[in-house]
Amino acid sequence: CKSAETPTEERIAEETPTKEKIAEETPTGETPTEEMEAGDANHKVQSSKFNVQSKVAGQTIVMLKNTHQAHVMIGTQAYDVNDDRRMPLYLLNNMLGGPGMNAKLNLALREHNGLVYTVESTMVAYGDTGTWSIYFGCDEHDVKRCLRLVRKELDKFMQKPLSDAQLKAAKKQIKGQIGVACDNRENFALDFGKSFLHYGWEKNVDRLYEQVDEITAAQIQAVAQELFDKNRLTTLIFK
């Protein structure tokens, strides 16, 4: 059994993609165009708990994998299980790329334009940090167009708060999804177990409904403005 090797700062620096490396891996030999970039490659996202900085925040990284279609992931560091902003992100994520057919990204990329078969957004909260990301697969020649459409949907949440009707509908939908999910006893048990490990008490579905009801449009917009900042997002493209 080999012992785990702790990466040195020099090794981390060597393995971190640079703009020159990205340019080499881009078919044109140039850095991605402004249309494809998520933001300033020099921008860094810092964890408030561990003083960890992301060296790829704001970059678009293209990896040539000779795949049948392009696989694209856009993401950033998000919130841990104890962060008050987690619940607004929970609702926002469901509206943007949740399992519902009316999810904004599904409508924009699949239903209205037929560019993808699968598109989804995901949030994961850990004990000390969290992640939020978007994934979609499309034909290679449609990547730029898909990225523009994704950016357009993100900007909508950043620029304008939800109306009372939109917020009410979103809450009603996610509470319905929670109710249906409770019928899956295995996932229900696992979820309750995680809650007990993190908080020391079992999850209460009625309390979860109350937390959803407490979410405001202003909270959702604030989370969108923080996480959807193009200088914060990293884009990874396999094609």
Residue ranges and their predicted role:
Residues Y90, Q225, L236-I237:
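Long, charged low-complexity polyampholyte tracts
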Residues T216-Q225:
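Low-complexity, intrinsically disordered Gly/Pro/Thr-rich segments
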Residues E9-E10, E14, E24, G29, ...:
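His/Glu-based metal-binding/catalytic segments typifying zinc-dependent metallopeptidases
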Residues C1, L92, V150-L154:
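Short amphipathic C-terminal alpha-helix that caps PH/PH-like domains
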Residues V72-Y79, N106, R110-Q159, D164-E214, ...:
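M16 family metallopeptidases and their MPP-like homologs
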